[in-house]
């Protein structure tokens, strides 16, 4: 099974592809999709959609795992994040991928053993858990790897 993990965002979206071959997890790829905050929102969403579509076409995942979001005190920020999630979910649906959502605390607990772990702890643990991730330095990318890892570990 190949899982596409997604840390949804409008400005800096993290993605990662992790495969399971028999009992072993294998990191395949990851990256960041950055958009310019000065661009109009529909153009930013289109860029996220087209870039993530290239990832889907290249790696052919069976499932997408996406981090659930919380409602921010800033309603505009929450709304923009909702737009990004909608664009992502629409793409997932268009390619008929199974999808699972995970709460941030569940991802943190699965990867670090502690549901309130800091970003640097997640980054450290994914480097220990999945060979090939040592070059990752961006926390959004690390979160996406952690989300894909969690999806595999939870056996969903």
Curated annotation (Swiss-Prot):
Cofactor(s) the record lists: Mg(2+)
Principal location: cytoplasm
Keyword Transmembrane helix: no
Listed GO biological process terms: DNA recombination; DNA repair
Subcellular location: Cytoplasm
EC code(s) of this entry: 3.1.21.10
MF terms (GO), sorted A to Z: crossover junction DNA endonuclease activity; DNA binding; magnesium ion binding
Binding-site positions, Mg(2+) 1: 7, 140
Entry keywords, A to Z: Cytoplasm, DNA damage, DNA recombination, DNA repair, DNA-binding, Endonuclease, Hydrolase, Magnesium, Metal-binding, Nuclease
Enzyme class: hydrolase
Cross-referenced CDD domains: RuvC
Domain of life per record: Bacteria
Catalysed reactions, semicolon-separated: Endonucleolytic cleavage at a junction such as a reciprocal single-stranded crossover between two homologous DNA duplexes (Holliday junction)
Positions annotated as active site in the UniProt record: 7, 67, 140
GO cellular component, one term: Holliday junction resolvase complex
Co-factor binding comment: Binds 2 Mg(2+) ion per subunit.
Binding of Mg(2+) 2, residues: 67
Binding partners and assembly: Homodimer which binds Holliday junction (HJ) DNA. The HJ becomes 2-fold symmetrical on binding to RuvC with unstacked arms; it has a different conformation from HJ DNA in complex with RuvA. In the full resolvosome a probable DNA-RuvA(4)-RuvB(12)-RuvC(2) complex forms which resolves the HJ.
Known function: The RuvA-RuvB-RuvC complex processes Holliday junction (HJ) DNA during genetic recombination and DNA repair. Endonuclease that resolves HJ intermediates. Cleaves cruciform DNA by making single-stranded nicks across the HJ at symmetrical positions within the homologous arms, yielding a 5'-phosphate and a 3'-hydroxyl group; requires a central core of homology in the junction. The consensus cleavage sequence is 5'-(A/T)TT(C/G)-3'. Cleavage occurs on the 3'-side of the TT dinucleotide at the point of strand exchange.
Official protein name in the record: Crossover junction endodeoxyribonuclease RuvC
Organism per entry: Rickettsia felis (strain ATCC VR-1525 / URRWXCal2) (Rickettsia azadi)
């Amino acid at each position: 099974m190949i899982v596409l993990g997604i840390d949804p965002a409008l400005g800096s979206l993290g993605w990662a592809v992790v495969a399971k071959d028999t009992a072993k997890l294998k990191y395949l790829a990851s990256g960041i999709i950055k958009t310019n905050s000065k661009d109009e929102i529909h153009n930013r969403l289109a860029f996220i959609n087209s870039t993530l579509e290239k990832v889907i076409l290249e790696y052919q995942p069976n499932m997408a795992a996406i981090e659930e979001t919380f409602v921010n005190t800033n309603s505009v920020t929450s709304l923009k994040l909702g737009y990004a999630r909608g664009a992502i979910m629409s793409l997932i649906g268009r390619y008929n991928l199974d999808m699972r959502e995970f709460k941030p605390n569940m991802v943190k607990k699965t990867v670090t053993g502690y549901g309130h772990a800091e970003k640097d702890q997640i980054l450290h643990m994914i480097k220990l858990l999945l060979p090939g991730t040592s070059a990752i330095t961006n926390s959004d990318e690390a979160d996406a790897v952690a989300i894909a890892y969690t999806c595999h570990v939870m056996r969903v």
